[in-house]
Amino acid sequence: FNYQNQFGDSRLYGNDLEDNSSRIIYGLENNFKLIDKRFDLNINQSYDFKKNTNYTRQINQTSNFSDIALEAKTTINQLSFNIDARLDNNELEKKEMNYSLDYNNRIQLNLNYNETNSRAFKDMSSDTQSLGVILGKKINNNIKISMSSNLNLKDNYRPLKQSLNVSLFDECSKLDISYIDERFNDNYNMKPSETISVSFHMDYLGFFGFDETSNLF
C-alpha cells in the first residue's frame, strides 16, 4: 500500500488474485521551496465502491474509504530523503512507514528503514521493523566494492541478509564476485544459507555465470 500503487490498474502484486474493485482516487500533489530547497508532498486516498474485495481483504480495509497514503521527498546537496507512509483512515496512526536516505558522491550510501504494524495486512501476525544498509566505494576506474545488510530491529538487530560484492570491469566486460549470507524467520521453516557466486558479463557475447553454494547450518 503506497501513494503510487493507488493509481495502478492492479494494486495487487503477482497474478494469483485479481483486483476486482472499481474505485475513485483523489488527493493532493504539491511542491514548495523552503530555505531554497525544493520539497515534494503527495497525499491520496481511494474510495472503493465494493467492500470485501480481493485487495481490501489483503490490506485489512473494512470500509469503502482506504487508509491515507503519503509521499514526501527532497534533496539537500548530495543527500536525497524520501518518506512513504500509510496512515490509518480513522485515527491517523501510522500503519506503514518507509524512510530512505541516499548519498552518492565519493561513496554510495543507501539507508532504508521500514516499520509495519501487524494490522496493516491480513497475513501479518506481529509488528516488524527493519533497516537496510548499502555501502559502496569505487576504488578506481576498474574496481568497485559494495556491501549490504538487512537488519531485524525487532530481534536485537539480527541480520536477515548480508552480502559483500567485488566488481572488476572495463569498457566491455564485468566480473562480479559475491558472498551472500541469509538468515530466515523460523516461521517459514527455511534454513540459513551461505552463497558464493561468480558472474561474468561481456558486451556482444552476453552473460556467463555460476554459483557455488554451501549450507553450513
Regions of interest found by a model, annotated:
Residues 1-217:
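Outer-membrane beta-barrel translocator/pore domains, especially the C-terminal barrels
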